[in-house]
Amino acid sequence: MAQRSQQASPPPNLAADKAAALRLTPVSRETESRLDAYVALLLQWQAKTNLISPATLPQLWTRHIADSLQLLTVAPDARTWLDFGSGGGFPGVVLACAMAELGGSVTLVERNAKKAAFLREALRVSGGVGQVILADIGDSVDRFPPHIDCITARAVAPLHQLIGFAEPLLHRGGKALFLKGQDVEAELTEAAKYWRLQPRLHASLTGGQGWIVELDRIERQSATTINGTRA
């Protein structure tokens, strides 16, 4: 028991990092409590399952949670969310914790069975509102809610591939918010080979070289291929 307690202990400076994160992206006490429960579970699982990079644990709140919460500043009215490749729960579980208070929900798509099990447990323990779909993104479109306000993805796939997954859903309305890093311009240039789009870029509130790519209107370029498929 003592060994398990030691493994689950947060990094020494996590409290300070949490305070910094909540200054960037304030939440209610209720949502904060849900996030605390999620973080505690993540730290327990992290000891035996690599959910996030160990190097980022000291900045878990600013690097991961605030990075996820900032999507709510770009789409404050969104209530039905779809998260591609949810992995360790960023941004999907974080948004689900916020949606519990706002009357919304999040559908989390994850192809790894162990990570999908973690996501289900994270929703249960935290009280976040959502569902987990164990599937590849491209194979699960018929299982998504009929209307999506906002599609998200973080560290899942190149931008042009994400757009391919999102395109049939965006035609029903809504928008996509993809979290990208310092190579965002190169990814946009590559995506423009396959798609006509008018992206809006939002600098990350967490600093560094992160960006949010906002998309709502996209069209396929003619006579191009995406992953070998004729557009």
From Swiss-Prot:
- What's the catalysed reaction? guanosine(527) in 16S rRNA + S-adenosyl-L-methionine = N(7)-methylguanosine(527) in 16S rRNA + S-adenosyl-L-homocysteine
Enzyme Commission number(s) of this protein: 2.1.1.170
Xref: Pfam families: GidB
Q: What does the entry list as the binding residues for S-adenosyl-L-methionine? A: 85, 90, 154
Q: Where in the cell is it found?
A: Cytoplasm
Give the InterPro entries listed for this entry: rRNA_ssu_MeTfrase_G, SAM-dependent_MTases_sf
- Cite the GO molecular-function annotations of the record: rRNA (guanine-N7-)-methyltransferase activity
Gene3D superfamilies from the entry? Vaccinia Virus protein VP39
Tell me the keywords, alphabetical order.
Answer: Cytoplasm, Methyltransferase, rRNA processing, S-adenosyl-L-methionine, Transferase
State the source organism's domain of life: Bacteria
Q: Which EC main class describes this enzyme?
A: transferase
The record's GO CC annotations read: cytosol
PANTHER family (UniProt xref) = S-ADENOSYL-L-METHIONINE-DEPENDENT METHYLTRANSFERASES SUPERFAMILY PROTEIN
Family listed? Belongs to the methyltransferase superfamily. RNA methyltransferase RsmG family.
What job does this protein perform? Answer: Specifically methylates the N7 position of guanine in position 527 of 16S rRNA.
Q: What is this protein called?
A: Ribosomal RNA small subunit methyltransferase G
Q: Which organism is it from?
A: Rhodopseudomonas palustris (strain BisA53)
